[in-house]
UniProtKB/Swiss-Prot annotation:
Entry's transmembrane regions: none
InterPro entries: LS, LS/RS, LS/RS_sf
Protein function: Catalyzes the formation of 6,7-dimethyl-8-ribityllumazine by condensation of 5-amino-6-(D-ribitylamino)uracil with 3,4-dihydroxy-2-butanone 4-phosphate. This is the penultimate step in the biosynthesis of riboflavin.
Family: Belongs to the DMRL synthase family.
Positions of 5-amino-6-(D-ribitylamino)uracil binding: F22, A53, L54, E55, T82, V83, I84, N115
Molecular-function GO term, any one: 6,7-dimethyl-8-ribityllumazine synthase activity
Active site residues according to the UniProt entry: H90
A GO CC annotation given for this chain: cytosol
Provenance organism: Brucella abortus (strain 2308)
Reactions that this protein is recorded to catalyse: (2S)-2-hydroxy-3-oxobutyl phosphate + 5-amino-6-(D-ribitylamino)uracil = 6,7-dimethyl-8-(1-D-ribityl)lumazine + phosphate + 2 H2O + H(+)
Assembly and oligomerization: Homopentamer.
Protein name: 6,7-dimethyl-8-ribityllumazine synthase 1
Length: 157
């Protein structure tokens, strides 16, 4: 996929990576991909860790409120985590609600968010999506956030 952002449109953007570390090894792989993509783009970033995917949208909201009160302002956000289907309905709730909340934040607050929360059937699928040499969803989410930063600037939002 080609991303619609040139270096000029997003000159040194500063992003917040919010990572859920429910599965530490998978979180490391996703974070590695996101950092590599942001480094390659010349972006700067902070990283904050939360317990699970449902806590990611709230953390982004906290960061937005903090910026309104003199804290760090971020140009965009990268959400990283893994939700693996289990034997209960919990997978559906976490998958649907984390995605819905990120979409709501993005639209209602006009912010750039790259969604790198994996929702998979098993650990094998998670690894295929997390590893940089495979699908590199961490890198994809970071590049998506950069693209959205560029589009927001292009439209003057």
């Amino acid at each position: 996929m080609e991303f619609l952002m040139s270096k000029h449109e997003a000159d040194a953007p500063h992003l917040l990576i919010v990572e859920a570390r429910f599965y530490d090894d998978l979180a490391d792989a996703l974070l590695d991909g996101a950092k590599a993509a942001l480094d390659e783009a010349g972006a700067t970033y902070d990283v904050v860790t939360v317990p699970g995917a449902l806590e990611i949208p709230a953390t982004i909201s906290f960061a937005l409120d903090g910026a309104d009160n003199g804290g760090t302002e971020y140009d965009g956000f990268v959400a990283l985590g893994t939700v693996i289907r289990g034997e209960t309905y919990h997978f559906d709730i976490v998958s649907n609600e984390s995605c819905r909340a990120l979409t709501d934040l993005s639209v209602e607050e006009s912010i750039a968010i790259g969604n790198g929360i994996l929702t998979v059937e098993n650990e094998e699928q998670a690894w295929v999506h997390a590893r940089r040499e495979d699908k590199d969803k961490g890198g994809f989410a970071a590049r998506a956030a950069l693209t959205m930063i560029g589009l927001r600037k292009k439209f003057g939002a």
